[in-house]
């Protein structure tokens, strides 16, 4: 085992990376409220794991979506637990994100030189809400259907460009299979990818600039 570690150490300098992480200075004013961002990240990772597990059984069609969710809940081993954890961690992620934003704002973490960190955080907040909107529709029950119909119909009030935006979101004039397909693609591929990219940027900037000082 030692020889394997030495082989990787010689090429990747693992110990130097570990020492840099461990030796990072943590200001004395940091308290439990500074952990809210990390908790949000943990919830996201739980979402990815449980969501990936459900993709093996979920069917993104208007005819089979609801039945496939019921199948996950009743027939798949621990399916009820996986979906429940997915839902609970989704709610927790939104709550922790909101509390994290308040903490950063109240402690002045958005001020120079951390403006870009704040911008990426706001983008992540928008992506988090988008997860909720797209995921809500996937069971394709009455609540999900009407939620999608209302949300995608909001831009219709915008003059000139409203109707094209609605059609872009729905995939057609009305809510149907193309809408579910688009929301499924957004929820399982586009949004996770964007979130991972912006989270990486967010944490790299925090790593570079450090945690903001007390007010």
UniProtKB/Swiss-Prot annotation:
SUPFAM superfamilies: Transmembrane di-heme cytochromes. Its cofactor is heme b; heme c. One of its GO terms (cellular component) is chloroplast thylakoid membrane. InterPro entries: Cyt_b/b6_N, Cyt_B6_PetB, Cytb/b6-like_sf, Cytochrome_b_N_euk/bac, Di-haem_cyt_TM. Heme b 1 binds at residues 100, 202. Heme b 2 binds at residues 86, 187. It is a multi-pass membrane protein. It is found in: Plastid, Chloroplast thylakoid membrane. One of its GO terms (molecular function) is oxidoreductase activity. GO terms for biological process: photosynthesis; respiratory electron transport chain. Keywords: Chloroplast, Electron transport, Heme, Iron, Membrane, Metal-binding, Photosynthesis, Plastid, Thylakoid, Transmembrane, Transmembrane helix, Transport. Heme c binds at residue 35. It holds the Pfam family Cytochrome_B. Binds 2 heme b groups non-covalently with two histidine residues as axial ligands. The chain crosses the membrane at residues 32-52, 90-110, 116-136, 186-206. Heme 1 (or BH or b566) is high-potential and absorbs at about 566 nm, and heme 2 (or BL or b562) is low-potential and absorbs at about 562 nm. Component of the cytochrome b6-f complex, which mediates electron transfer between photosystem II (PSII) and photosystem I (PSI), cyclic electron flow around PSI, and state transitions. Belongs to the cytochrome b family. PetB subfamily. The 4 large subunits of the cytochrome b6-f complex are cytochrome b6, subunit IV (17 kDa polypeptide, PetD), cytochrome f and the Rieske protein, while the 4 small subunits are PetG, PetL, PetM and PetN. The complex functions as a dimer. This is Cytochrome b6. The lineage of its organism: Eukaryota, Viridiplantae, Streptophyta, Zygnematophyceae, Zygnematophycidae.
């Amino acid at each position: 085992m030692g020889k394997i570690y030495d082989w990787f150490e010689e090429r990747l300098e693992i110990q130097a990376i570990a020492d840099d992480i461990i030796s990072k200075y943590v200001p004395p004013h940091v308290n439990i409220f500074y952990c809210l961002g990390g908790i949000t990240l943990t919830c996201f990772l739980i979402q990815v794991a449980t969501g990936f597990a459900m993709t093996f059984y979920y069917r993104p069609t208007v005819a089979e979506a609801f039945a496939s969710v019921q199948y996950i809940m009743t027939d798949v081993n621990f399916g009820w637990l996986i979906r429940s954890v997915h839902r609970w961690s989704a709610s927790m992620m939104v709550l922790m994100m909101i509390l994290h934003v308040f903490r950063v704002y109240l402690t002045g973490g958005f001020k120079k030189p951390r403006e870009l960190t704040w911008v990426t955080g706001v983008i992540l907040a928008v992506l988090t809400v988008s997860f909720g909107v797209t995921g809500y529709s996937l069971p394709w029950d009455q609540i999900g259907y009407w939620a999608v119909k209302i949300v995608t119909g909001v831009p219709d009030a915008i003059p000139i460009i409203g109707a094209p935006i609605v059609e872009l979101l729905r995939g057609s004039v009305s809510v149907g299979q193309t809408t579910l397909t688009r929301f499924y693609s957004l929820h399982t591929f586009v949004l996770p990818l964007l979130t991972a990219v912006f989270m990486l940027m967010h944490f790299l900037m925090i790593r570079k600039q450090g945690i903001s000082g007390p007010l």
